[in-house]
């Protein structure tokens, strides 16, 4: 009989369950802070419509800008951000390779346009979900 089926081996299962619960709690804390910042008027840039819907489902009510809907270019997104007149903007694009590339490009271009960028939510969520979740709309599930 494999060791995992022996009596008392539930410790590993319980430890994993506890770890997953702690991870979920941390993700929820980050999302609560994100909702607070959004409520204060800090816009959030996401990739598309599904990401907006996911954030709305998670209770985020403030301004959310879609970076890739309707064939927008980076210049279109920058122009939309400048119209917001916000002191700071949160970038929360997907966690895949293309999302990382767009995040880098947006950050560079927006900083050049003298816009303060907040990547802390992206960094914290990526550290928590790693390769388990590839996109923002996956956070809602």
Q: Can you say where each PLM-predicted feature lies in the sequence?
A:
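Short active-site oxyanion
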Residues: 38-44, 62-63, 88-89
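Phosphate-handling DNA/RNA-contact segment within nucleic-acid enzymes
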Residues: 2-41, 49, 53, 76-77
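N-terminal, charge-rich alpha-helical recognition modules
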Residues: 53, 59-62
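Alpha-helix N-cap/helix-start capping motif
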Residues: 48-49, 96
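TOPRIM fold recognition
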Residues: 2-15, 57-58, 67-141
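Charged, low-complexity surface patches
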Residues: 44-45, 99
């Amino acid at each position: 009989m494999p060791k995992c089926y022996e009596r008392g081996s539930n410790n590993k299962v319980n430890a994993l369950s506890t770890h997953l619960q702690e991870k979920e709690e941390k993700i929820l804390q980050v999302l609560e802070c994100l909702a607070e910042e959004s409520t204060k008027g800090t816009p959030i840039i996401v990739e598309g419509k599904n990401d907006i819907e996911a954030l709305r489902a998670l209770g985020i009510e403030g301004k959310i800008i879609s970076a890739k809907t309707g064939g927008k270019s980076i210049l279109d997104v920058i122009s939309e951000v400048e119209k917001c007149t916000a002191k700071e903007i949160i970038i929360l694009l997907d966690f895949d390779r293309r999302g990382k590339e767009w995040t880098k490009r947006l950050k560079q271009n927006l900083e050049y346009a003298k816009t303060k960028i907040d990547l802390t939510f992206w960094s914290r969520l990526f550290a928590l979900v790693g390769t388990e979740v590839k996109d923002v709309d996956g956070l809602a599930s």
